[in-house]
A protein has these predicted regions:
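Membrane-embedded alpha-helices and immediately adjacent juxtamembrane helical segments
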Residues: 2-320
Length: 320
């Protein structure tokens, strides 16, 4: 029995390492072809993710995020105040730092101080320039990482960077408010429909699904928009769903860990949130970049040379 199991295991290893790469879609049924393609994409994406040292790129983006988080939040809150929904944005921000109220208040104080110094006194010009330059640097690093994954050598022009990136910053607070408003609306609907035995559970499920749908859309849009090349939407949807689901699952774990860490606030104070934020940023960027790798492999699957020596697969060609 043990010998048979070893033979089956060797056969499976041989199939995954060699045979599956020689199978074409015409030789198998449609469902089996989809399964084989999924296995190929998963295998190649993990290989490219590890061999390309993408986690090192995630660490670099974590460092850039740490330097840019206050300026970015300052811009978002400034835009929110301009539209008159800063209180709603603050509520969302505090809920994201559940269990770390001291850290949340410290960050909000830094944001207010940053905005005051950026628009007052003799340093108004320098402050605004530094504010926008910090944000532009982070978005440039994000684009450069996505271009690295997609093997794109030419970045966006400076004009396109400014127009594209600041359009995102303008839309982001609006999307946050839309998400909050939609969740509140559906929660109200659930309360009003408690007497409807069949519809109430469905509405509760939809309320819980809203954050996932918005996160899926966010990652899908990021995978399509951020690389400076043509990315087909159909190849970004499933990676967006996978990355978005992983991100939401990690968010639940992160919020739970924040509540646990809050017990140590008497010792560490608001500094207890710093290592947690670094961990959150590192894992979040890792999830995001793996999703981008999935998207790249899915779009370029046919251009890979599926030979016996799969380690020599070329990444130089793109399917547009």
């Amino acid at each position: 029995m043990s010998t048979m199991n070893k033979e089956k295991l060797k056969g499976l290893q041989s199939f995954l390492k060699d045979d599956i790469w020689r199978v074409t879609e015409d030789e198998v049924s449609k469902s089996r072809g989809i399964l084989y393609n999924a296995i190929k994409i998963a295998t190649l994406s993990v290989r490219e993710f590890t061999q390309g040292r993408i986690l090192n790129k995630a660490s670099a983006l974590t460092y850039s995020t740490l330097l840019s988080i206050i300026p970015i939040l300052a811009i978002l809150f400034a835009i929110a105040r301009g539209f008159g929904f800063s209180n709603l944005l603050e509520t969302q921000f505090r809920s994201g730092l559940e269990g770390q109220s001291a850290a949340a208040e410290t960050i909000l104080g830094l944001i207010d101080s940053y905005l005051v110094h950026a628009k007052s006194g003799i340093f108004i010009g320098v402050g605004l320039v530094m504010l926008f330059w910090t944000i532009l640097s982070l978005t440039y690093n994000i684009e450069r990482t996505f271009n690295y994954i997609w093997q794109v050598k030419k970045p966006r022009t400076l004009y396109r960077k400014m127009t594209d990136y600041f359009s995102i910053l303008l839309l982001l607070p609006l999307l946050i408010v839309l998400s909050s408003g939609l969740t509140i609306f559906m929660s109200t609907m659930v309360k009003n429909m408690e007497d409807f035995v069949l519809l109430a559970p469905l509405m509760k499920f939809l309320v819980r699904l809203v954050p996932f749908i918005l996160t899926w859309a966010m990652f899908t849009g990021l995978f399509v928009f951020m690389p400076n090349t043509k990315v087909k939407l159909k190849y970004a949807i499933i990676p967006g769903i996978i990355a978005g689901t992983a991100f939401q699952a990690f968010q639940y774990l992160y919020i739970g860990s924040q509540i646990w860490v809050s017990r140590y606030n008497a010792i560490y104070g608001s500094f207890a949130a710093i290592p947690m934020f670094l961990l959150w940023a590192q894992i979040s960027w890792g999830i995001c970049l793996y999703g981008a790798e999935l998207c790249y492999v899915a779009q370029n699957l046919r251009n890979y040379s599926f030979s016996k020596e799969t380690a020599n697969i070329s990444r130089r060609y793109h399917d547009f």
